[in-house]
Amino acid sequence: MFFVVIIALLLIIYEYYKYLSSKPSGTPPGVVGLPLIGIYWYCLWYDYKFPYRWFGYYSKKLKSKVISCYLGSFFTVIANDYASVKELLLKEEFDGRLSDAYFIKARAFNKKLGIFFTDGDEWREQRRFALRHMRDFGFGRRHEIFETKSMEELNILMDMLKNGPINENEKKYLYKYKEMHGENGEYGFVGSYLNKLKESNIPSSYTEEYLLLTLLDFILPATISTSSNITFAIKFMMHFPNVAKKVKEEIHKVVGSGRLPTWEDRNKLPYTEATIRETMRYETLTPLGVIRRCTKDTTFQGYFIPNNTTLIPNIAEINHDPDFWGDPKNFRPERFLKDDGQFNKDFSLPFGAGHRLCAGETFARFMMFEVFATLMQNFDFSFVEGQPTRIEDKFPGIITTPAETWIRLKPYS
């Protein structure tokens, strides 16, 4: 028995030594983890719900804006300041996605589908097709009909998705769409895609499964992130009544009460728009962006980055960096405005950058402005007695969402 224990200990020591020596040479300074689980035990100790805080902590401890570690078996590099995050997002070699993770495959029939978690030639082809045809119907640019119907369609889409990703609702919707779709019909993006499926000699990536995942990749971020941002904005208005007062005064001075605010009013309502931007900085919905993958050996910030390295842009860390923002803990929309009332450059990167820039940025900005400005024009908001009111209450995830918040609405007078 004693001999078996000694052998087991020697094997553990050997595996740990092999693990310690597996870190590629020339890569960023890192944190030593454990075999199989990597640095997860650090996260459990420091802040398992919001790992961006742990990354930021060790970035300071190691005195390096770029650090490395093992997340399970994945060698990972994390960028923690604006310069390194921006380079990571713009670097073509970092356009890959971590598509082999279990939870990513599980959502896509155990395949690489959609445009969110895929890369390479198939991703480029599918993204190009989606953007080209969706822009024909108003997505991603100014379009009067699109702007008129967007609010109604958003509610319908959210109702469709209430049971989560890839369920019978989406399949029934697609089958019904196919029945309605004529030979030359053009019923939006789905109709264009179904027409594409009828063509001969099309790339093998064009399938109904790919269409389903592409729809989800557009719809879920658009609905969840937009509604979460608006909820956070209203919650912040209750916590910061002086800001809410300035927003209301600006809207009623420019728009009045006889009509609703429109996108055309946006440049005339700089403080309102700045408040939305400050909301996205103060509460970063995607704290770690969307995880990237290095597609070939390269260098980054003076370090060697081997092929297949996992890459994380710590966007939440840069949005709370006192060296960059001065007073990041303060909710201060004025930071996005120049002295003459014009907009400063937005360094908060809420929609990413580079080839992977969020395709729905125009849609999201339009929806947030329209809904937030309309609500602020027409209602006063206050907390409900006895209900949680803490500003830090939220649910972690790829997209941070607000915790349940009870709000009392009273018509503005």
Locate predicted features.
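Central I-helix of cytochrome P450 enzymes
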Residues: K172, K176, E199-H252, T279, ...
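Conserved cytochrome P450 K-helix/beta-meander segment immediately N-terminal to the heme-binding cysteine loop
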Residues: P313-D340
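Cytochrome P450
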Residues: M1-L10, Y70-V77, F139-E152, L161-K172, ...
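Cytochrome P450 heme-binding "Cys pocket" and the immediately downstream C-terminal segment
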Residues: P241-V243, N344, T362-I398
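Cytochrome P450 heme-thiolate "Cys pocket" and heme-binding signature region
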Residues: Q301, K338-M368, D393-F395
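Conserved cytochrome P450 K-helix E-x-x-R motif and the immediately C-terminal K′/meander segment
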Residues: W41-K63, L260-G302, P322
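N-terminal membrane-proximal hinge/A-helix region immediately C-terminal to the signal-anchor transmembrane segment
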Residues: F2-K111, D121-E125, M151-I156, I291, ...
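Cytochrome P450 catalytic-domain helical core, especially the substrate-recognition surface
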Residues: V32-Y57, F75, Y102-K176, Y187, ...
